[in-house]
């Protein structure tokens, strides 16, 4: 009798597997993501699943160094292979650097200029001043600065708190003609676009002078309202998309894994159409990200 019960129980488990999706054998390639209950991807497959932990990194994991005339810089994402990262955070293909840059209280940088590099800097903590090519501008949280190649600049922090920025660097190619003056932008003056991927509330930057990037790249501040979830979705070859948390600590659905994402932490979506990403504001606190979309896949 006991044996019959065990056999019946085993058959019931097999039937349940048939209803919910067969447990597949060992796979040789990562399955496509799907919401279907009988999809192969409704099980995890560690042998072939993308190791998404390599694609998310916090600046705290990097050692500080001096750069760009006196900033204290710490890498978040670095050049590498977005399909097979050689180490954590080494996922950049098109841009040169993605990092945190900070000025200590009551300090400033020395004059700095590069003829081959352009910088986008977004303030996420503190306030200060930038001088570039004869222009001056106050900067604070909510603002961004674009510094073209060939323009000398300095930053100043007259306050008693750190000035912290997200710095994105790109190299220009031969024949590229950069702008001749800096651009200053502010997302707080922009009417929001609501509802992309269910829950994103996006604001681009309103610039005094439109920046001229060498890459097909754009930036925006994106929020998610209290207790809401963004649609998990994937990206393919040629898409270099990065999300950096600026405010709040969110939940991140990343492939078939779940992460906390903290301020100063950024992730790049693997461009293989295998890894859905979707952020969740599970709290009653504000959530804000810096979005970067470098869309080489949209070039004709």
How should each PLM-predicted stretch be described?
Residues 86-90, 108-115, 156-157, 230-236, ...:
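Short histidine-centered beta-strand/loop micro-motifs
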């Amino acid at each position: 009798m006991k044996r019959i019960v065990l056999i019946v129980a085993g058959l019931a488990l097999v039937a349940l597997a048939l209803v919910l999706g067969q447990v597949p054998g060992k796979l040789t390639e990562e399955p496509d993501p799907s919401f279907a209950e009988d999809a192969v991807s409704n099980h995890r497959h560690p042998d072939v699943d993308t190791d998404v932990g390599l694609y998310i990194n916090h600046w705290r994991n990097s050692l500080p160094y001096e750069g760009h005339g006196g900033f204290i810089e710490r890498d978040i994402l670095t050049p590498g292979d977005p399909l097979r990262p050689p180490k954590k955070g080494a996922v950049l293909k098109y841009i040169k650097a993605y990092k945190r840059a900070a000025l200590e209280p009551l300090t400033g940088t020395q004059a700095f200029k590069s003829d081959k590099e352009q910088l986008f800097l977004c303030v996420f903590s503190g306030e200060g001043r930038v001088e570039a090519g004869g222009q001056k501008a106050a900067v604070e949280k909510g603002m961004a600065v674009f510094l073209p190649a060939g323009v000398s600049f300095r930053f100043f922090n007259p306050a008693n708190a750190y000035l912290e920025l997200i710095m994105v660097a790109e190299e220009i190619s031969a024949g590229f003609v950069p702008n001749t003056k800096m651009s200053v932008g502010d997302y707080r003056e922009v009417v929001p676009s609501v509802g992309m991927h269910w829950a994103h509330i996006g604001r681009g930057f309103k610039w005094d002078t439109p920046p001229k990037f060498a890459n097909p790249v754009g930036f925006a501040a994106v929020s998610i309202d209290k207790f809401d979830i963004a649609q998990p979705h994937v990206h393919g070859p040629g898409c270099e998309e990065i999300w950096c948390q600026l405010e709040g600590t969110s939940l991140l659905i990343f492939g078939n894994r779940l992460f906390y994402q903290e301020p100063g932490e950024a992730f790049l979506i693997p461009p293989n159409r295998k890894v859905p990403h979707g952020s969740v504001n599970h709290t009653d606190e504000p959530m804000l990200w810096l979005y970067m979309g470098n869309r080489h896949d949209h070039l004709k």
